[in-house]
Amino acid sequence: MALLLVLQWTSAQADGFDQSAWDALLKKHVISLRSGQATEVDYAGFAADRSQLKQYLASVSAVTTAEFDRWERQAQLAFLINAYNAFTVELILTAYPDVASIKDLGTLLRSPWKKRFIPLLGETRSLDDIEHGLIRGSGRYAEPRIHFAVNCASIGCPALRTEAFAGDRLEAQLEDAANAFLSDRTRNRLDANTLRVSSIFKWYRRDFEKGWHGANSLAAFLALYRAQLGLDEGTAGRLKAGKIGIEFLDYDWRLNAKGSGKS
C-alpha cells in the first residue's frame, strides 16, 4: 500500500498542474471560427467571470520552482503556455472595453509585453519573460510550435484554443494548432510563385530553422506542412530549393474580441 501511494504521488507530480478551471473558462468564453482555424474571445464574458480567472491565476502563481521542476517536460510547457494565455486575457481585462488592441496597453517606452505584473515561479515577470525567457530561452523545450499556441489577443495571432493545454496531450494539441494556423488562407497562402505567410515566421525565423524534424531552413519547415498550406509535392520541392519566394503578410493587431469578424 505504501509503495502504491508513493507511485501515485510521483505520477501526480509528473503530470503537473490541474488546468480544469482555465479549461472551463476557455470552453465558456472562446468561440471557434472556420473549423478552429481562428477564434474570437468573449472578453465581456471573461470580465463577468473575472473572479474565477483571478482564482486560477492565483493558483498558477502559487506554484513553486521546486514543484515545477518535478514535473515532466511536457507538463511544464503546457503550464507555461496556459499561464501566458491566461495572463494575457487578464491584461486585456484591465482596460476592457476601452481597448482596441493589446498595443494600446503599452507606452512609448515600454510595450505591454514588457510589463512586469505576473507573479510566477518566485519572481514578478512579464509576458516576454514567459515566452522568451522561460519557454524559448530556457533550452528545455526547443519547440517551434509554441508560436501556434501562445496567443497575443490579436486577430493576427494563432487561435486561442477552446481548451487548456495539457501535458499528456500536448504533442497532439501543438500539432493541431500548427495544422489549423497553417491551413488558414487569411494568414498563409500561395500566390503564384510566392508563399505569403504570417509575420510570425519573420519574427521567430530562427526557431523554425533549428532542425526540428530535420528542418534547417524556414522553407524546409513550411514544406513539412505542405498539405496544410495547399502545396503539392512538386511545389513543396521548389519551395525547399529556393525557387518559390517567401514573403511576410502584415500582422493584424486588432483585438480578437467577439464580433471582430475576421479573427
What are these regions (language model features)?
Residues 10-14:
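Sec/Tat signal peptide C-region and signal peptidase I cleavage site
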Residues 1-8:
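Bacterial N-terminal signal peptides
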Residues 15-263:
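Interaction/scaffold regions that mediate signaling and macromolecular assembly across diverse proteins
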